A protein has these predicted regions:
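Transmembrane alpha-helices and adjacent helix-loop boundaries
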Residues: 1-364
Length: 364
């Protein structure tokens, strides 16, 4: 059905309201360094970092349905590149080099894995992370005779947080554009059926490698931004495989059907991991395994899928029981009306906005 002028007006108003709300939210988050304690700021750094990692991971894996465990490889490349070059280059120059190294590595890996899918792609990603970690350990022991690098730079926690927040905004914007573009539609078709995507004229190798590079660049930059937070970085810390598994679990817990889905996995898991690592450090891995089992058996579509199914069930009209007549039938009909989508504050703002900006036909 063709979109009417009223639909266009409402969609435009919703877009304006959404942009205004997101601007206020980002502004409030940007003020966190001046409002929170050192511990609170440290927690926010961890959470925003995982937001970047999870959304960047979902750009590739959420569309192509190829589960990547190479997150720790690119995250570690970004972190260790800064650690190696910080003594001979300015900080932002090390960020640029880390970005270039991450993109080049993603290009090589993307080309090598064009014909790999399923569990073989998962194993390759995990093996890549371990291979880079072992090569870095070998290099440090045999060439530099050390097992780590010191990172001393005037880049405090507030600056790290602000840069990560800006990176999170950018990766969300890229995801928003991707979901509304022909390229993003092609990626979704590749995830559904790669053979069909090729038959309709989509350049499958180019699309997969391109989105893999984009995802890897954001992951690498997040690792580079996190490097100044720690005074000493060693290969086992930088290329920790736990990062890859945590990101996957966060993404699946939140759900990949919506762009904001990963947030529903990042926020609760970051809070719980902070508590567990502080109070019960040896139970954290067991907890992650339990969460993954719950997702597989009970939440295959994540929290977003659960919310959508629940709302659909509430919106479905109830069937009329047999035997109800007269007033009882009328009462049941009122109770069984479908629940309409609440408009809330956004709806009130939209109505006010419509009064301020009337339809073109109403202008004099």
């Amino acid at each position: 059905m063709a979109e009417t002028a009223e639909d266009i007006r409402r969609r435009r108003n919703r877009t304006v309201v959404s942009i205004a709300a997101l601007t206020l939210l980002v502004g409030a988050l940007a003020a966190a360094p001046w409002l929170l304690s050192d511990y609170g700021l440290s927690f926010m750094i961890n959470m925003v970092c995982y937001v970047v990692l999870t959304v960047a991971w979902a750009l590739f894996s959420g569309t192509t349905r190829l589960v990547s465990l190479a997150t720790s490889a690119f995250f570690g490349v970004g972190m260790y590149t800064v650690a190696m070059l910080i003594k001979v280059m300015p900080l932002y120059a090390t960020f640029a080099v880390a970005l270039a190294v991450g993109a080049a590595l993603a290009l090589v890996v993307g080309v090598l894995t064009l014909r790999i899918s399923g569990m073989f792609f998962v194993i390759f990603g995990f093996g890549l992370s371990e291979m880079i970690r072992e090569l870095t350990v070998w290099w440090e022991i045999n060439q530099t005779h050390t097992m780590g690098r010191y990172v001393y730079v005037t880049f405090d926690a507030a600056m790290i947080y602000e840069h990560l927040l800006a990176l999170a905004v950018i990766v969300f914007f890229i995801g928003w554009l991707l979901r509304r573009s022909r390229f993003g539609l092609g990626l979704l078709l590749i995830g559904e059926d790669e053979a069909v995507a090729q038959q309709v004229g989509i350049n499958v190798p180019f699309a997969k490698v391109t989105i893999f590079i984009v995802s890897a660049v954001f992951i690498t930059l997040s690792g580079a931004l996190m490097a100044p937070r720690f005074g000493f970085i060693n290969p086992n810390f930088a290329f920790n495989p736990l990062v890859s598994f945590v990101v996957v679990i966060m993404a699946f817990l939140g759900g990949l059907q919506r762009l904001w889905g990963p947030l529903l996995g990042v926020i609760p898991l970051t809070i719980l991991s902070e508590v567990l690592q502080t109070e019960f450090p040896f139970w954290f891995s067991i907890f992650l395994g339990a969460v993954f089992m719950v997702i597989v058996y009970f939440l295959p579509r994540g929290v977003t899928g659960l919310l959508e199914d629940g709302w659909t069930a509430l919106s479905r009209p109830l069937e009329l029981p047999r035997g109800l007549t007269g007033p009882l039938r009328e009462v049941w009909a009122r109770l069984s009306r479908p629940i309409m989508l609440p408009r809330g504050i956004a709806g009130v703002i939209e109505d006010r906005w419509a009064k301020i900006l009337p339809r073109p036909s109403e202008k004099r």
